[in-house]
Regions:
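All-alpha prenyltransferase/terpene-synthase fold signal
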Residues: 1-306
Length: 306
């Protein structure tokens, strides 16, 4: 359900964006459910489960920087649908890789239909996004292709072993920029591109979008440790339990490699390597130690800087 824009947007802006976002939502739900009774349930599953719709909102917002007549036109609306379809497709694939039981408060697709069906459903949604983008012109098609490549490359860089000698923090930022920043950047660029805001504006909003993506993920790293389960709906330290080294842990490892890690940090890394994080008490202890260590504040500062 579409509510209001964040950050106390001016009423005049909301008056333009909200109806356009409602149109994007209607088109999105139509696109994910226009096949047949066999295909429609999995393809519509996550779209109907809701979501923030950050990417189409950004497309609609940056379109306001160009021709106001084009800013809520057919191409901009279809671009909003395409970026959200692409995002949703990656969620199907992510949940298979992560073996996630839930997504957006609903059972994940592979939990309901199995891994093969979930992967193919993601592929179908990418194909449908590509069909929409094909009508937006060659520049939009190329941008979508390059972005999807970056999404996949980011996932591969996260999945495969990091090359020896690679700075862990720099490597992680690259992963975040590819996995999350690239699609948000394209979402911002599409609005400016299709409303003919000009090349300079396209470049600015694209860079802005990528920085938002990296900052969002860094903030999520903080939230994973600093918030409570009542607020987020998940156990603090979930990433740690899944074996994911997020920024606070990477900062510890980098300091250790440089011979600059304090005793508290060394104790945390030791606990991570030897403790059973499936044990709630052990996980809670590691989370409590990380909350007190300066790396958490440093990660928060990095998110603000980005």
């Amino acid at each position: 359900m579409i509510g209001s824009l964040p950050l106390n947007a001016p009423p005049q802006l909301e008056g333009r964006i909200i109806p356009a976002l409602e149109a994007v939502e209607a088109r999105l739900l139509d696109v994910v459910s226009n096949a047949d009774e066999t295909i429609n349930p999995p393809t519509s599953h996550l779209a109907e489960a809701g979501g923030k719709r950050l990417r189409p909102v950004l497309t609609l917002l940056t379109a306001q920087l160009g021709d106001t007549g084009l800013a809520v036109g057919e191409q901009v609306l279809d671009a909003g649908v395409a970026v959200e379809l692409t995002h949703i497709a990656t969620l199907y694939h992510d949940d298979v890789m992560d073996e996630a039981p839930l997504r957006r408060g609903a059972p994940s697709a592979q939990t309901v239909w199995g891994n093969s069906a979930a992967i193919l459903t993601g592929d179908v949604l990418v194909a449908r996004a590509s069909q929409l983008v094909a009508a937006l012109g060659p520049r939009a098609v190329l941008a979508h292709a390059k972005t999807f490549e970056r999404l996949c490359m980011g996932q591969l860089h996260e999945t495969l072993p990091r090359p020896a000698g690679t700075d862990p923090v720099d490597h992680y930022i690259r992963v975040l920029a590819d996995k999350t920043g690239s699609l948000i950047a394209m979402s911002a660029r599409y609005g400016a591109m299709l409303a003919r805001a000009g090349d300079a504006t396209e470049r600015i909003v694209e860079e802005f979008g990528e920085k938002i993506g990296v900052a969002f993920q860094l903030a999520d790293d903080v939230i994973d440790l600093a918030s409570d389960s009542e607020t987020t709906g998940k156990t603090p330290g979930t990433d740690l339990r899944e074996g994911v080294d997020t920024m606070p842990v990477l900062l510890l490892r980098k300091a250790l490699a440089a011979g600059e890690l304090d005793a508290a940090g060394q104790s945390i890394l030791s606990r991570l390597s030897t403790g059973n994080l499936d044990d709630d008490a052990v996980l809670a202890d590691v989370v409590a130690r990380l909350r007190l260590h300066p790396v958490l504040a440093r990660t928060r500062e990095m998110a603000v800087t980005w």
